[in-house]
Amino acid sequence: MRGKTAEDLKLLDLLDPVAEAVGYEIVRLRLMGGERNQRRLQIMAERPLLEDGTGGDMNVEDCAKLSRAVSEVLDAADPISGEYTLEVSSPGVDRPLTRLKDFDTYEGYEARLELDRLAEGRKRFRGVLAGVEGDQVAIDLEGEEETALVPFAWIVEAKLVLTDELMKRGAQTRAARLESDEQQTSE
């Protein structure tokens, strides 16, 4: 889910080590637009989440730093034919969930899932994330008594639902990042 197409996956192989080398993780990469349209390479990234709960957020300086590092590699390797625009951003508060670990990290928060096949007569689900069991995502669906287990491989799109609780977590994450940035600046 971090990349949709074969071209996205090749770009991830090229750019993941670059992002990691400068201290970030790529959450999602999409090369969008066709031959006639201006193509756009969209990279969503974040700082790795640390044991103490800090990280996971990116500010404008982080986006610029990653953009410069990625641009150097893209210019040298030239993996994209034609012109394109590079966009680097944070995933935002109501972020996409693209890695199995995301479903564990955001346990207790509401999410929407879309599957590549029917499960119990539908492809779309909304509920509260209940963690991960092996390679399956656990989700508590409204009106259901038992926790549903969905194979991660079946999920084509997943996103957190914007709630007051999620907004509060986002504010706490930003505050922790700002405090960490201030401590590093004063050292």
Swiss-Prot record:
Highest taxon above the source species = Bacteria
The record's listing under CDD domains reads:
YlxS_C
- Principal place where this protein is found? cytoplasm
Keywords assigned by UniProt?
Cytoplasm, Ribosome biogenesis
Q: Which residues form a coiled coil?
A: none
User: What cellular component terms from Gene Ontology apply here?
Assistant: cytosol
Which InterPro entries does the record match to this protein?
Answer: Ribosome_maturation_RimP (IPR003728), RimP_C (IPR028998), RimP_C_sf (IPR036847), RimP_N (IPR028989), RimP_N_sf (IPR035956)
Which is one Pfam family of this protein?
DUF150_C
Where is it located?
Answer: Cytoplasm
**GO biological process annotations for this chain's record?**
ribosomal small subunit assembly; translation
Spell out the family assignment given in the record's similarity comment. Belongs to the RimP family.
Its function, per the record, reads: Required for maturation of 30S ribosomal subunits.
- Name assigned to this protein: Ribosome maturation factor RimP
What is this organism's lineage? Bacteria, Pseudomonadati, Pseudomonadota, Alphaproteobacteria, Caulobacterales
| Gene responsible for this protein | rimP
